Amino acid sequence: MAYKFSDILLSLCLAATLASCDSVIYEDLPLCVATHDVRFVWDHNMDFSDRFAESVRSVTLYGFDRDTQVLRWIRTEKGEALAADRFAVDLEGVPAGEYSVVAWCGVENDSDDLPDSFTLSDMTVGSSTLYQLQCRMEREVREDGSHHSSSRLHDLFHGVTSMTVYGDDNPDKTGHHSYLLDLKKDTNRVHVELRSETGEALDPAAYTYTITEANGLLHHDNSLLDDEPITYHPFAVGETRATGVAADFDVCRLMADRHAALTVTDASGRKVVDNVSITSLALKVKDNYGHAMDDQEYLDRQDSHTFSFDVSSDGTWSGAVLYVNSWRVVLMSDVIFE
């Protein structure tokens, strides 16, 4: 059976079209090109739902060669664009390779009047390494060398992942590759209440509150590095609706194997609450929420802690009963004390 020349030419044209990665059909994204981006999710919270779009206003990505751990690229995005549906950081121009990627989110915040809360290491592409990447909480260093913080903190988030960026030498990896980066929140709001057992109104000016922990320096993997102890002071104090008083703190990451120590002192110098571990107290109610979590997962998910202490007629807390996030807690031992 003979074939006409025109039939053969038509067959060749069709084959060429199929080999062109559907560029005729998908003119905006030829499938013979590999493209890559990074998307983000923050569902590591007590809602167990993604709240990235409403909570994060800046992201900084560091891409390290997986073998040498040398920094190969940095990407930064900030502003209202992060609230867009399916926001992603485009990796166009990133060299092909296998990468360990670290994300710090919330460091850059130009939209409000708060000073910067955190500073990232000064990193140089081509020479800096993964182990040099740190995030440091800003603090006041006083003349005696002690470190203090009484500021509200911008919400800080951290995440890590691994990814491969494909180049022209991987024709079987064409198309779009999107990597999802899960975030954990590193900042916490702590609300401390003192409630009068006698019904007599307490004076907000009569109490001094501190939380002490050396947790202001975070490594690339979100672990705590050795740091000076930071004395946190409330950014706000006031009265409660009843006869009590309250103080609000922002503190950096809480760790299950460490203690952040709360002390409340009255005007006479008497310790109302003396060196109590709020970390241990917070974990007393972990199992009340109906989710299976280990201690560190709970501390990473729960970013808001309320501790209510009843002050007796002698002006101190008994050390036996308190409320944690509205749950009544009866203490059977002194394990919460450092």
Question: Language-model segments: which ranges?
Answer:
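C-terminal motif of bacterial Sec signal peptides marking the signal peptidase cleavage site
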Residues: 17-20
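Short, hydrophobic/proline-enriched secondary-structure or compact coil segments at domain edges
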Residues: 36-42, 191, 259-266, 322
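Short, low-hydrophobicity acidic/polar segments
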Residues: 73-184
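Bacterial N-terminal signal peptides that target proteins for export
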Residues: 1-9
